[in-house]
Amino acid sequence: MLAVLLFAALVATAYSQSNYGPGKPDVKIIPHPKTVVHEDARHVHKQVHLVKQVPVHRTRVQTIINEVPRIVTKPKKIKRTRIFRQYYPVDVPVIRRVTYLQPVHLERKVPVARMVVKDVPHHVVRTKKVDVPIDVPIKKIVEKKVVRYVENKIFRPRPVVQEKVRVVHVPKPFPVDRVIVQKNPRPRIIVEKKAVPVIRHIHTHKKQAVAVPRVKTVAEVVPNVVHQKVTYPVGKGGGSVQIPGGPLPVPEKF
């Protein structure tokens, strides 16, 4: 095969060098650059035909407002605590019991040998810990900003406001009271009522005339009894009995 190729090359060289008349002049072709226009549609994320490619136009409107300090006044409350004590009656007083723990002192009656601790010299190795910084490589995190495009999105104007707010606390002219009502027990006071005799002392006497009717009344006759010993005869013996106290009383209807 190689021999055939060499033979063909020799034959071609012989024919090219054969002179059948005047030779042609040598022409040298110099290549020159050509301008080529490449058309590329921007903001298109679909592989479609060039005729159907529609670029996406985005317009964002921002309303920028100047920074203005805004002062907000807030009242500062002055708090005051007021305690009101209310007492409610109880029949049995409330006793508050507080228990205190008192120490117990124990006396040792048997002498005990006391141990005395003395410092014995010994070798002390004093060391100090020093923190040595070590360079730790910190891996740098590369943040990739993901941008998502939405085709034919309409951006509405949105105001961008950046204002500085300063809060000023102003004290109120009157304090704010915090009312606390404490309800404390108080023993009930029982008052026993005792009957007190009412005595009216009259120190003056006044003589006053009293009308007397004109009616004559007969004074009651009261017998004047003289208490003496009276002797009454008794029986056949002829004796007598002395009865002390006078005579027997006379009946009314005698």
From Swiss-Prot:
The keyword Secreted applies. Its main location: secreted. It comes from the Eukaryota. It is found in: Secreted. The keyword Secreted applies. Keywords: Secreted, Signal. Prismatic layer of shell (at protein level). Expressed primarily in the mantle with highest level in the outer epithelium of the mantle edge and lower level in the mantle pallium. Residues 1-16 form the signal peptide. One of its GO terms (cellular component) is extracellular region. This is Mantle protein.
